Amino acid sequence: MRSVTEDFIPCNREEIETRLERKMDGNMRTGRERQQRNLGIDLLRIFCMFLICILHVCGQGRAMVRYAGREEVWYSVYILETAAYCAVNTYGMISGYVGVRSVRRPSRIVELWLRVFWYSALGTLIAVTFFHLPVESDTLYQALFPTMWKTYWYFSSYVGVFVVEPYLNRLVKSLGSTGKKKLMITLFLLCSVFTMVPRVANRDFLGIGAGYSFLWLSVMYIIGACVRELTDQNGPERQKQECSEPGGAETSITETENTAGVKEQKEQDSEKNVDFLHRSGGLYGMLYIICVLVTWVSKILIENWTTSVYGEARYGRLLFSYASPTIVICAFCLLMIFSRLKCRGRVLRELIQFFSPLAFSVYLMQLQPYFWEYVLAGRYQFIAKLGPAAACLMVLVMAAALYLECTAVDLVRMAAFRLLRIRRVAQVITDFALRPFAELTEQENREASGEV
């Protein structure tokens, strides 16, 4: 083990200053993050899972059955599904937004896998034993090997993202503000805009899988991480801190004698950075609504036109996909809106802290194979027979009820996990599995906390 003095043997004065700046900045930042959790992001998790419930009510629940002569009901409910379609992308961006500045805890993925296995295996056992539902080989494989069989496609893809997360973080942190923006724009154009037309023709030349893939979640992770880094570097509080500290992030101590012209240029660049990601929440809200309407209207117009020309609806999913540019922009807008929310009030904060850890289980419960096929399928078809306004209201009510239903079930799982001390079990499994990589993991944690 190295001594304390060995860590601070300087090569020159600049190295001392750089190390001290980095150490002080990292300590202040991590201290603030430990004390002030961003409840806006936790609220966004809850909201996104509610949107996913809307998708499942409309889709598998068949609330969007299109009856002849009742197209107005289908159109009205479809706008709700369009507004909710960005939820998965937003979840991916949240992972990057939080993960780029969080201390990595490998046992977390083991805990999540045990939660997934709880719902897949135990749910199958209950369905077969108590409800005498049929067992097929494929269903059994899905229950016992939920990750490899993609029982829950999002979790299967997220496992890959979790493995490469440290390297994605290093990529983002190695870039300057301009580089991060260029990376975000490049990924958006390459993976979303340029794949739009080939996707309509069922051509997936980048292997994005219409957003159902590890590659796509990695792209969303990087965008979320870039947003976090840019907002932390260029936020109003950060700017004030840099202006009050000699030799801040824009100028080191040894560079204070630079020309006034260079300083003015940096100030102008800083103002541009602030303008880019610190617009008002109302602007992002308007942009979200515009993108939802564009996606919704385009689907209706394209399908009606192709029906009149070809006799059947075609190309309606031009903008209706996880990888669609408008859907990605919607997800980005939600992230920007909720990340700056100030959740005041003790009751509101307690509700957010209660529901947020349970949000992911709402997804697991709904995607459980037997629940998906025998409980959720066609459950809400009666909604399609209501009027337009009543149908929209009922979709929202049923989605909220489904969310609370799954949350109540997960409380049982949470109590069982505490009784079985699953967190401790996950930590033991992780320590044993990662013993050869312990030094690398410690290095990654130091980098994430700003100590290196």
What are the language-model segments listed below?
Residues 48, 74-95, 99-128, 132-161, ...:
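Transmembrane alpha-helical segments and their boundary/interface "anchor" motifs
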Residues 413-448:
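Membrane-proximal cytoplasmic C-terminal regulatory module of class A 7TM GPCRs
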Residues 125, 303-419, 439:
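Alpha-helical transmembrane segments of multi-pass integral membrane proteins
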Residues 63, 129-137, 196-204, 298-311, ...:
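Juxtamembrane "helix-exit" motif on the non-cytosolic side of transmembrane helices
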